[in-house]
Amino acid sequence: MTKLVDVPTQFDDRSFDQFAAAFGRASADGGRLLFDAHATEWASPYGLVGLLAAGQAARSPAGEPPLLTVPTAPEVLSYWGRSGFFRGARELFEIHGKFPRAQAVTDSDVLLPVTAVRAAEDVHDVVGHIQQRAIAILSSELGIDPKATMGFAMALSEACQNIVEHAGTGGWVAVQSYHWRRRLARRVVVI
């Protein structure tokens, strides 16, 4: 029997615990899972990476991939495509609904796409690429001195290494800069 896991309408660090609890309940008795994101209106990198991790964990003992219904809002689908989410999702889910096919991920001053970290050898390459883009984001968007971004690079490297060493499997990393002037009157970066 297929069990439903609703992806929150606003999927970020604040709604992740709700998602994780639903995932835990649905996966407790085994069976195939359906991650329903059709009503999702927004997802942060935190939510997208969390959804990929759940998909990785939800593969059935028989090897069947979990199901994923994609968001119906065109702008959400477009963002998920630009973020690189579907590159990883195609490997993990049986995807239902129309979604952007393989898009070339272009460099952006506000988005570092979802990037797979699969082995210790990957960490240096992944961190090197992401570090270059992160420095551009942190210095241009947040006005941080490029030298001061080394702490960010070290934290990112440690996080990527922890994926490999402690998770016992691969993982993903993504970074997005947000302009929340309405709420905070400043720019922030969410990792």
Model-predicted regions and their roles:
Residues M1-D6:
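Short beta-strand/loop segment at the start of cytosolic alpha/beta domains
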Residues V7-R90:
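Amphipathic alpha-helical interaction surfaces in cytosolic regulatory modules
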Residues F23-A26, A54-R59, A134-E141, L156, ...:
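Hydrophobic, Leu/Ile/Phe/Ala-enriched alpha-helical segments that form helix-helix packing faces
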Residues W42, Y46, A134-S157:
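Conserved short strand/loop->alpha-helix "switch" segment adjacent to the catalytic nucleotide/phosphoryl-transfer site
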Residues L52-A54, P146-R181:
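Conserved ATP-binding N-box helix of the HATPase_c
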Residues T72-S83, R87, V164-I191:
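Conserved beta-strand-loop-beta-strand hairpin that lines the nucleotide-binding pocket
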Residues S78-R118:
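A contiguous, low-structure linker/loop signature
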Residues V105-G143:
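Helix-loop-beta hinge of the Bergerat
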